[in-house]
Amino acid sequence: MANVEIYTKETCPYCHRAKALLSSKGVSFQELPIDGNAAKREEMIKRSGRTTVPQIFIDAQHIGGCDDLYALDARGGLDPLLK
């Protein structure tokens, strides 16, 4: 199974949607909350080049945000990455 990491904020609806999609596929993921954690937020920005959440990584490959995750799934590209 792939190593999935997702940077989140507690009140972010897109974070909840992304986690719901991953959970619906039976995927375990490491949630990395950035709420009140400046160091974790800086780590996310350095890794992804983006300041918005969620930011999703599968086996250290940057996938992007929630819309990127859903688009990847719609193209049939998500499931192969999760194996």
Swiss-Prot record:
Residues 2-83 form the Glutaredoxin domain. It comes from the Bacteria. GO terms for cellular component: cytoplasm; cytosol. CDD domains: GRX_GRXb_1_3_like. GO terms for biological process: cell redox homeostasis; cellular response to oxidative stress; deoxyribonucleotide biosynthetic process. SUPFAM superfamilies: Thioredoxin-like (SSF52833). Pfam families: Glutaredoxin (PF00462). One of its GO terms (molecular function) is glutathione binding. Disulfide bonds join C12-C15. PROSITE patterns: GLUTAREDOXIN_1, GLUTAREDOXIN_2. Keywords: Deoxyribonucleotide synthesis, Disulfide bond, Electron transport, Redox-active center, Transport. Belongs to the glutaredoxin family. Monomer. The disulfide bond functions as an electron carrier in the glutathione-dependent synthesis of deoxyribonucleotides by the enzyme ribonucleotide reductase. In addition, it is also involved in reducing some disulfide bonds in a coupled system with glutathione reductase. This is Glutaredoxin 3. It comes from Escherichia coli (strain K12). The lineage of its organism: Bacteria, Pseudomonadati, Pseudomonadota, Gammaproteobacteria, Enterobacterales.
